[in-house]
Each structure stands twice: as structure tokens, then as C-alpha cells.
């Protein structure tokens, strides 16, 4: 499995892999091909991961949104094999409920589970749990089955 180099990623901070934090400040118009390349790299790596969105701006251009939607539909199964969830961090409970509802639409369209949590710490804990469940860690699974 190819090693991941954090310097190869502009749109995702992978220093806490399997937590991949989306960097909206780098998502300027025309970013979708770069996004696709980074997601392809994460998929080729082959280990389960979670993408965390801390800043929930929705200023994506129509062209970028369309590019990503087409790619997500075409790669739904392959991405779902390694991307265990999209996690949105939203401290405000009312806004978090809205984000969770919006996430359900994406789940139906692209098949990747979505979670809305109150803090980055909760996102990291959830990511650890989700990726551990799917990592094929035989010792952990054996311990749970015993």
C-alpha cells in the first residue's frame, strides 16, 4: 500500500490519518479535479478513513459541485469501501440538526454515512471507532467475539 505524504494534499489535512480534515480555504473555484486526485490517492492507500468538515461553508461553485457529484456517483462503491463516514462538526445544536438532515440527502445519493457532531474531539473519536471497526484488526475482532 502506498504511503501517504501530507505534503501531497492541499484540500485535506491528513496529519491525523485516518482523520482527513477538509480545508475549505483551499477549495477555490476549479478545485474539483484536485479534490478528485486527493480522494483517489486516499482510496488507493486502501486503509479506512473518515473525512471531517469543521467549517461548513457552502460556497462551492456549480461546476465544482457537478464535477464532484458525477465522480461520487461513478465511484460510490470503491469510495464506500474505504471512506467510512463524512463527519460535520457543528457546535450549535439547532444548526447541527440542520446539517444532519442535509447529510441524509448525501447518504441517499452517494451511500457514504454522515454524522454531525458538536466538537472536533467527538469527530476524532468517532473516526477512530469507525475505522477500527472496518480495519480488519483480527486481534480486536477476536477479542470482541470471545
PLM regions and their residue ranges:
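Amphipathic, Lys/Arg-enriched alpha-helical "gate/interface" segment within cytosolic domains
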Residues: 2-146
Amino acid at each position: 500500500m502506498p504511503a501517504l505524504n501530507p505534503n501531497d494534499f492541499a484540500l485535506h489535512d491528513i496529519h491525523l490519518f485516518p482523520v482527513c480534515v477538509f480545508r475549505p480555504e483551499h477549495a477555490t473555484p476549479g478545485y474539483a479535479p484536485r479534490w478528485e486526485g486527493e480522494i483517489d490517492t486516499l482510496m488507493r492507500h486502501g486503509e479506512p478513513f473518515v473525512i471531517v468538515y469543521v467549517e461548513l461553508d457552502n460556497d462551492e461553485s456549480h461546476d465544482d459541485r457537478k464535477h464532484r457529484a458525477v465522480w461520487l456517483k461513478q465511484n460510490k462503491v470503491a469510495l464506500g469501501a474505504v471512506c467510512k463516514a463524512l463527519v460535520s462538526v457543528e457546535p450549535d445544536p439547532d444548526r447541527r440538526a440542520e446539517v444532519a438532515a442535509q447529510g441524509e440527502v448525501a447518504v441517499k445519493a452517494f451511500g457514504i454515512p454522515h454524522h454531525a457532531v458538536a466538537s472536533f474531539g467527538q469527530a476524532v473519536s468517532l473516526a477512530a471507532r469507525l475505522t477500527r471497526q472496518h480495519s480488519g484488526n483480527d486481534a480486536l475482532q477476536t477479542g470482541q467475539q470471545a
